[in-house]
């Protein structure tokens, strides 16, 4: 059994905290092949580390409807159950296979308001080692413009490490 995660040990700049939690996540995930367990762990550890995270979790590509995302492991209030590719911030990330960094979600065309308290959002695509899109990782904040390139780079590195595709 892994040592209990203590987010209070993580200090320094945001970039340093991403690097520290990446090491912690890698240690906890070592030897665990199950993608659901890996997703649940990543979501929980990141939510515990960053105070500006309001909702943190995965939307997984539905194998029965490959142009649709279905809610996966997350931390936070009730998530939207399904999101079509191309709709909202998560759907845009899935369709474009590119990170979406949104300072004001209310100004984003087609934004899906799963929780009206969300003000800004970052969504990072998650790829299998063979390059297939398997999910998107969604983080919302109640603070406008809460995310920047440091978050995008830190999350991309953690997700690449956890799910096998180099960034």
Could you tell me what each predicted segment is?
Residues 55, 123, 136:
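Short hydrophobic/aromatic beta-strand element in the GNAT-like acyltransferase core
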Residues 127-141:
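Sensory-domain boundary capping and coupling elements
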Residues 1-78, 157-167:
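Intrinsically disordered, low-complexity terminal regulatory regions
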Residues 120-128:
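A short, aliphatic-rich beta-strand micro-motif
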Residues 144-151:
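A short acidic/glycine-rich loop-to-helix N-cap element
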Residues 50, 114-118:
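Short loop/turn motifs at secondary-structure junctions and domain boundaries
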Residues 61-64, 68-114:
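Regulatory sensory and allosteric helical modules in signal-transduction proteins
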Residues 93, 97, 131, 151-166:
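Interdomain signal-transducing alpha-helices
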């Amino acid at each position: 059994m892994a040592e209990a995660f203590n987010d209070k040990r993580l200090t320094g700049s945001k970039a340093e905290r991403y690097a520290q939690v990446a090491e912690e996540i890698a240690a906890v995930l070592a030897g665990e092949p199950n993608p659901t367990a890996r997703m649940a762990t990543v979501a929980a550890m990141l939510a515990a580390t960053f105070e500006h995270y309001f909702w943190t979790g995965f939307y997984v590509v539905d194998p029965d409807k490959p142009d649709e995302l279905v809610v996966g492991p997350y931390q936070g209030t009730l998530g939207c159950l399904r999101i079509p590719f191309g709709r909202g911030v998560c759907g845009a990330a899935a369709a474009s296979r590119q990170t979406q960094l949104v300072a004001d979600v209310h100004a984003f065309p087609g934004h899906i308001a799963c929780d009206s308290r969300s003000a800004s959002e970052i969504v990072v695509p998650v790829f299998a080692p063979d390059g297939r899109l398997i999910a998107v990782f969604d983080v919302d904040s109640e603070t406008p413009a809460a995310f920047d390139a440091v978050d995008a780079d830190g999350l991309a590195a953690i997700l690449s490490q956890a799910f096998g595709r180099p960034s």
